[in-house]
């Protein structure tokens, strides 16, 4: 997915008169995942996950390809068993042979050392869940964890994690330490409670093990299904890492966001809030829908925040009694005619009151001035007045005259 450069006005001659609205992103180290880089000032990366069974090799290849073709830059695949790990090797080979190489993340959970070691040979990144990687079955009769019991499990975690860390380190591959609020280890729950603090300490424990083995190709996530918990956890991990001199990139997401309009709003509320604060280097919108439905939401969030510009930005007033044409209908026509373009700002304004002033930053404007006619603008300059029924056609002609039109 092409991303146009975002104009930085901070160093212009008149910058002292401009309030800089550019989001200042938290500084993080670059982590390579195949041919994609997360963090390090690179554009925020868009991810998703296929929902095919990994044992279905052809179906998985097709699912990965569908996502990649519409702009998904890294694709995650579940690997619950050794059979799935071996199937993933075939998926990777077939993908390269029939399409192209796509960065893949293997999702490994319960007691997954052997599985993770196998998949690390074939793909670019392994995701592990600290609460499940060394799975301790909860003891319903337990009332506390002594420090020695806590440390004993910590030693077991290190023993189990070390071979994977060494393998990834020596191959130049990466790992996501993916904490989920709903699957914290029992010892963390007893020590910190079901809290963002417990999530953060769970991640920090794994980070320290990796660092002790000189492995820093890490991405961290703090996912929760409730937005306030997710926000608190990400803000806390960013604060803790800054205090500890850690600069690992963060993968943002609201897990189990649901579907439809509310699922999109819920994901946006969590992801966009953090991105606006400069927190986050890669995102996934998790919807209970086909994975392909997640990608446009990701790019819309990034475009709305000015972090990536990959489509036309439409500016349109909400309509009122002053509107001189059917604004909803015209906006739809303009969008359908121009949505394939990249990087333009087009304003559709219903009257002269909102028109020139509020669309001043747009590349092109379509404004109702008198009944039956619309005025076309290039930036702040009025170019021509045309009959309403010729408005969209003449807008296209204006874009063509500026050599900014491409055929769909």
UniProtKB/Swiss-Prot annotation:
It catalyses: (2E)-4-hydroxy-3-methylbut-2-enyl diphosphate + 2 oxidized [2Fe-2S]-[ferredoxin] + H2O = 2-C-methyl-D-erythritol 2,4-cyclic diphosphate + 2 reduced [2Fe-2S]-[ferredoxin] + H(+). Keywords: 4Fe-4S, Iron, Iron-sulfur, Isoprene biosynthesis, Metal-binding, Oxidoreductase. Belongs to the IspG family. This is 4-hydroxy-3-methylbut-2-en-1-yl diphosphate synthase (ferredoxin). Its cofactor is [4Fe-4S] cluster. Binds 1 [4Fe-4S] cluster. Pathway: Isoprenoid biosynthesis; isopentenyl diphosphate biosynthesis via DXP pathway; isopentenyl diphosphate from 1-deoxy-D-xylulose 5-phosphate: step 5/6. NCBIfam families: ispG_gcpE, PRK00366.1. Converts 2C-methyl-D-erythritol 2,4-cyclodiphosphate (ME-2,4cPP) into 1-hydroxy-2-methyl-2-(E)-butenyl 4-diphosphate. One of its GO terms (biological process) is terpenoid biosynthetic process.
